[in-house]
Amino acid sequence: MRRAELAGLKTMAWVPAESAVEELMPRLLPVEPCDLTEGFDPSVPPRTPQEYLRRVQIEAAQCPDVVVAQIDPKKLKRKQSVNISLSGCQPAPEGYSPTLQWQQQQVAQFSTVRQNVNKHRSHWKSQQLDSNVTMPKSEDEEGWKKFCLGEKLCADGAVGPATNESPGIDYVQIGFPPLLSIVSRMNQATVTSVLEYLSNWFGERDFTPELGRWLYALLACLEKPLLPEAHSLIRQLARRCSEVRLLVDSKDDERVPALNLLICLVSRYFDQRDLADEPS
């Protein structure tokens, strides 16, 4: 498309598509029209440079001007974009923040746990699971929520006292604990996915011991350096912990040290220092 000015008015003059393409993509190797013999057959290998160049011209002319990729939306991974917020955690209420010594001790202990998990992963992965343990597929969000937290908690959405209605333990109802024989079978994609599922659940509900155990175990299995998705998730987790901590009435509440621990691990072990609690 060329611009022309006539009598002070700007008009747009269209040129043929071939000329427009030529202006946008000039020929690097200008080729004059080839005077080939009548016996030229573009379907056979070229015998001369002229035949080769002519064959390239023919193939280029057969290419469509616009190509549309056929994309199957079902194959696209959900939530491809990653939005990383740089906002920090909510400051701890007075008396709720842990000491620096306590935080350093938790980081050291967590590092030891991670080393042991990696060291014995092959052993625990080879152990046979109990007959009642069926791990959901990686993409089954509802299945993993029920597996980790229990069908009762996921259905009610509220935290209540545990009841012993039967002599045995019904893990389907109360959730399976993060046993080494279970978490050792989870690859990094599954670890990240389950961390996302539980973080989403936590974003709308209160903190529970079952949730805390699984979050700790998943962080222990999370490999460094962090992928962007995992980086965003753990920051989101730490911020949510700080928000829930603000709602706790007493510093003696059993949720406070658990929330402090998760904030500590995200900020000090995974190097998100802007989220760290100021030592008390």
Swiss-Prot record:
Chain ranges passing through the membrane: none
UniProt KW keywords: Cytoplasm, mRNA processing, mRNA splicing, Nucleus, Phosphoprotein
Keyword Nucleus belongs to the record: yes
Region annotated May play a minor inhibitory role in snRNA binding to 5Sm (SNRPD1, SNRPD2, SNRPE, SNRPF and SNRPG) during snRNP assembly by inserting into the RNA binding pocket of 5Sm, chain positions: 1-39
Localization annotation: Nucleus, Gem; Cytoplasm
CC annotations in GO: cytosol; Gemini of Cajal bodies; nuclear body; nucleolus; nucleoplasm; nucleus; SMN complex; SMN-Sm protein complex
Domain of life: Eukaryota
Residues that bear Phosphoserine: 81, 166
Family: Belongs to the gemin-2 family.
Name listed for the protein in its UniProt record: Gem-associated protein 2
Native organism: Homo sapiens
